[in-house]
C-alpha cells in the first residue's frame, strides 16, 4: 500500500512538473557558413554550438527566457507558456556575425526541422530551467 501511495505521489509531481514547461527547438538550416558554430544560450546558460543542418529540442520552464548567441546584444526574449511549442532559427548574414535568433511559425519550422538532424546528446551542454527576471 505504501509503495502505491509513493508511486502515485511521484506520478503527480512529475505530471505537475511536466505541465509547467514548454518545448523550445533551436535550429540552423544548412547554409554557406562552413565551420561557423554559433553558441546558443538560454538565460546566460550555454545550451549548444549549433551546426548547420542541426537542431536541439529542449524543455524550458514556463516564464520569460532570453535566448542569445555569442553576441548577447542580439538576443530574443521568449515568454514560454506551459505546453507551448516554440522554434528559434539561428541566422547569420556574414562570417563575422555571431548569429541572431528569429522566432519562426511552428508549421514552417516543423517543415524545416524535419529535414535536419538532432545534435548529439554530448553536444548539448544545458537546459533552460528558470525564467529570466524571476518569471
Model-predicted segments: where are they?
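Hydrophobic h-region of N-terminal signal peptides that target proteins for export
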Residues: 10-18
